[in-house]
Amino acid sequence: MSLLEDIVDLLKCVLEYFGVPPDMLVPVWESTHCGQYRSLVRMIGTNLPLSPYPRLRFQIPLQTFNKHSHIDVSVDSPAIPTLADVLWLVEDEGDSHTKFRNAVPLRKKCVPHGYETPSLGSVSVKAQRGGGVLAQSTQPDALLKISALEEELQRLRAQIATIITAPAGPVVSPTDPGTPCSAPKPAPVLTSTPVCPPPPPPPPPPAMPTRTEVSMSEMIQQRQAAKKETLAQCGPSLTTAPSMLEVLRDLNQVKLRSVERSPGGTPIRRRRSKGVACSSDPAALIAEALKRKFAHRQRDDSFGKENHSAEPSPFSSPDTPRIFQHTRRSQGRIHL
């Protein structure tokens, strides 16, 4: 306890030296004082003869540029910035000087002296806007290029279909000089006699995509009309359901259809005759030509599989060698 008493006496001496009454040593949580008496640090700080540090004070000017290019201090404007000023600063176009939200735009009105030099920010904003305009103008160009490529693809499909359906021979179909399929012209022969100018090129063939589009639309209309007719014919028959008595009555008279079978007993399947591809559809013509071209390869593969099955497998037992009777007799006579 002597140590605590010594500490209390030391604190009393220190407080008396600084001019603090010793009654202030009561704990803070027991005292009811407010303000400068709330803590020991506040009490020491208020009693010390120290000059307070000057506080920072922000001064917001109320000067704004009026329409008549003179400074008017009496303009009714808020002195404290708000959140609206933050949004206004974000939407700023980049000026070389500071202005307030309620000020008149200096670009439309007269600019005071000293603010005539543009900033780098304004130049960058203009460049960005110019880039956006260029990006918008390039979109229709890209659409035009895509449409041109689609037309060229349809033209190539039509040409491939005409080449496939044409009979084999030296006949060369006239092609469009603008297409990549056109063959290069031979070099002119140098002769001493004057050469007549070459004849004009033949006119290009009519565009195939238009005919294909018309034919496809006609086919779709015909199919829809045929579907409607079949539905109209089958409608009354579907509504009337057959009675079970009629079905059971004819059960004894059922006859099975005769099916042709091979010698092994398996039924013979006949190949279905496929109709001729539509001449107006280039994709169908190309598919039919490819099927004809690769049909012999499928036949060769199936024939090779059948022959391969007859060959001995590596896992089968080896064949026993056959020994004829005359060799046995000859060998027996030699040993005897």
Swiss-Prot record:
Residues 325-336 have a biased composition (Basic residues). Residues 139-166 form a coiled coil. InterPro entries: Mtfr1. It comes from the Eukaryota. GO terms for cellular component: mitochondrion. It is found in: Mitochondrion. It comes from Danio rerio (Zebrafish). The gene is mtfr2. Residues 296-336 are annotated as: Disordered. One of its GO terms (biological process) is mitochondrial fission. May play a role in mitochondrial aerobic respiration. Can also promote mitochondrial fission. Belongs to the MTFR1 family. Residues 297-309 have a biased composition (Basic and acidic residues). This is Mitochondrial fission regulator 2. Keywords: Coiled coil, Mitochondrion. Its main location: mitochondrion.
